[in-house]
A protein has these predicted regions:
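Iron-sulfur-associated redox domains of electron-transfer enzymes in respiratory
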Residues: 1-214
Length: 214
């Protein structure tokens, strides 16, 4: 397990490096609410949000998408032949996803990536996506993640877990994809793993203690 410290002063510089090799998505405020959108060049995700109005699911599994196309123009050689639509499966990173939303992807995966059935659209999108989670230190009053096999610091489904630590983030690397992203961003300030793990565990316990709705 590796844990890095990311100074908030260096945060935007790292995102600028990531823009060179990833499409970046994150929470963006729209009027009164936040939703996950592809970030404009040079724009940082708003990590001060509580929860997004809609799930970030559409980044991997859009509500509707074109899968095939064909032409009825008989002057074209391949008219009336159905063809798969070209899709952009270039590397993308979702910055600031909540652990509960990442866990939801794990649950959906049970339907779309099984020995009996493998959905090619889902699998390609998942393979292209790196999920950088943001630990939830101030759960909403309606949150019930701890009763659903999840939690505000849950790691399953994530590639990196970010923990807000005042003037910096602690970035816990969970997968090879997560390590690749951190390397690409140039975030290379390692910390004492044992001490950082204790700090993260304390934050987890304090956050879970705030979930009292259920």
């Amino acid at each position: 397990m590796k844990i890095f410290s990311i100074s908030k002063d260096d945060w935007s510089n790292g995102l600028a490096q990531l823009e060179k090799s990833y499409r970046l998505f994150g929470p963006v405020k729209e009027e009164e609410f936040h939703n996950f959108k592809e970030l404009a060049k040079g724009k940082s995700p708003d990590l001060g949000y509580l929860n997004s109005r809609l799930s970030p699911k559409a980044i991997i599994y859009p509500q509707s998408e074109a899968m095939f196309e064909y032409s009825l123009d008989e002057s074209e050689e391949d008219h009336h032949i159905m063809k798969e639509v070209d899709k952009d499966y270039s590397a993308r990173a979702v910055i600031g996803i909540r652990p509960c939303d990442a866990k939801a992807f794990v649950l959906v995966n049970h339907n779309f990536d099984t020995p009996e059935y493998k959905d090619p659209y889902w699998i390609r999108a998942c393979e292209a996506t790196t999920l950088v989670g943001l630990a939830c230190d101030a759960p909403c009053s309606s949150c019930f993640c701890t009763t659903a096999g999840c939690g505000p610091y849950h790691e399953e489904g994530l590639d990196v877990l970010l923990v807000d630590a005042a003037d910096h983030y602690l970035a816990k690397i969970l997968t090879e994809k997560g390590q690749k992203l951190v390397n690409a961003a140039g975030w290379d300030t390692a910390v004492d793993a044992a001490a950082a793990a204790r700090q993260i565990e304390t934050g987890r316990q304090e956050a879970e203690a705030k979930i009292t709705a259920f």
